[in-house]
Structures are given as structure tokens and as C-alpha cells.
UniProtKB/Swiss-Prot annotation:
It catalyses: (4aS,6R)-4a-hydroxy-L-erythro-5,6,7,8-tetrahydrobiopterin = (6R)-L-erythro-6,7-dihydrobiopterin + H2O. It is an enzyme of class 4 (lyase). This is Putative pterin-4-alpha-carbinolamine dehydratase. It comes from Paraburkholderia phytofirmans (strain DSM 17436 / LMG 22146 / PsJN) (Burkholderia phytofirmans). The keyword Transcription regulation does not apply.
Length: 96
């Protein structure tokens, strides 16, 4: 079973990510993205969806026109895990 990150691990891992913030009321991280238009936002979401399916680890997300908000947490573990960090790292790599 996958284990939640400790507070120290979470702080260390979060420091290595670009633009991700801890969610105040839960053990999760979140980032907002803004694109030129809906097509660009949807293309980004498609790339994330393909990777998430490969990882069998799916984000919570919200999209309005050119904005996408993603929240990552591992429900089975009850909080942030290495899976979330790996998906966030992938997301960072396609938005750099």
C-alpha cells in the first residue's frame, strides 16, 4: 500500500515543484494554469489525462475556458504521496 508523505518529505518535495501550493484544509497540492485559449487548455488536459491513465492516478481538476486548476492527493492513502509528486513533476515538464 502506498504511504502518505511525512510533513518533512512533503515540504522537501513541494520545494522542487514549480507553482504548486499546499491546500490549506487538506493533505493535497494545487496549481492553477492559464492558456491562450480553450483549445490550448484542452490540449494540456488531454496530455495530463493520458499520463494519469498510464499511472492509474487521476487528478481532481476544474476548467473554465483558458484556465485549468489541478488538485493532487491520493485518496487511497488519505493524503499526498509520491504518486502525486510524480504526476506534478510530469505536469511541470509539459508546461515549462
Amino acid at each position: 500500500m502506498i504511504q502518505k508523505l511525512t510533513s518533512e518529505q512533503r515540504a522537501t518535495q513541494l520545494a522542487g515543484l514549480h507553482g504548486w501550493q499546499a491546500v490549506a484544509d487538506r493533505d493535497a497540492i494545487q496549481r492553477q494554469f492559464k492558456f491562450a485559449d480553450f483549445n490550448e487548455a484542452f490540449g494540456f488536459m488531454t496530455r495530463v489525462a493520458i499520463k494519469a491513465q498510464e499511472m492509474d492516478h487521476h487528478p481532481e481538476w476544474f476548467n473554465v475556458y483558458n484556465k485549468v486548476e489541478i488538485t493532487l492527493s491520493t485518496h487511497d492513502a488519505g493524503g499526498l504521496t509520491e504518486r502525486d509528486i510524480k504526476l506534478a513533476t510530469f505536469i511541470d515538464s509539459i508546461t515549462a
